[in-house]
Amino acid sequence: MNYKLLERDARLGDYHAKKRLEQRMEQLETLSIRDALGYPLTYAPSALPAQLLADIDKMYDNISVTSIDTEVSIEEESFHSCRIEGATTTIDELFDIFKAKRTEKKGDRMILNTYRAVKYLNITSRRDVDTLVQLWKIVTDGVCDNAGLSGEKFRSGNVVVGTHEAPDVELLDYCMKQFFDFCHGENISHPYTKAAILHFYFVYMHPFCDGNGRISRLLTTDFLIHSGLENFSALTLSKTINETSAAYYQALENSENNFHDVTPFIQY
C-alpha cells in the first residue's frame, strides 16, 4: 500500500493501518531526520551487506587519482549532471566551454556554472544553509527556471516534480536545518549509506525553485570526499545516474511511498 495512504488511514483511526506501520517500524532503524509529516525516515541497517561493502572498498582502493584526473572528472561530472537536466551540449564541445568560457547556449552556461559550483565547494570549509544558498546562486546563474518561485533563501511556492509533490514552503527552514544537523551529527555505519540518505532527503525536500538535481549530486560527492573517501573526486556520479535514470527515479519513488524507508534508494 502507498505510504501516504497508509499514513492517512492510521491518522483516521484505522487499526490495521496503524498495526502495519508499527510492524514495519520494528524491522527498521529510525533516523533523527523527519519527513514533512513529522515522521522519522527509516532504513534497514542490512541494506548494504558486508560482502558488498568489502567489494566496493576493494574497487575504491584501486582508483588512482591525480590532479589531472580530478580536473577531468569535475568537467565530466558537470557535463553529465547538466545532461540529466536537459542540456544538449555534446562531449566534443566541452573544450570550448572550459577553455574559451563559451556560454552561447543555455546548456553551456549550465555546465560552466556547475563546474564553478564544484570549485566553490573545494575552497569553502562551511557546510550550512548559507553555503547551500550560495551554491544555488552559482548553479542557476543566468539559467534559472521557475525564477518566479525564487524566495529569499528557498523557493517561495510549492512545486510538483513528476509524481512527487515537494513539501510546503513553510517547512523548508526547519527541514533544511535537519538536513545539516543530520549531515554533521548522526553516526551511520558507512558513508555510502549516509550519502544515500542525504541525497534522498534533499531531492525529497526540493528546497529551491530550480537546480535541485545538480545540487543534490554535487553534495553527495562532496559528502563522500569529506568523509575520507577522497578518490571519489576522480569519479563521475552523474554519468552513472544518467545511464540508469529509470532505476534511479524508481528507487526515489519507492522510498517515498514505502513508509519513507530509504532502503530502496540506498540499494540503488
Q: Where are the language model's segments positioned?
A:
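FIC/Doc superfamily catalytic core
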Residues: 1-268
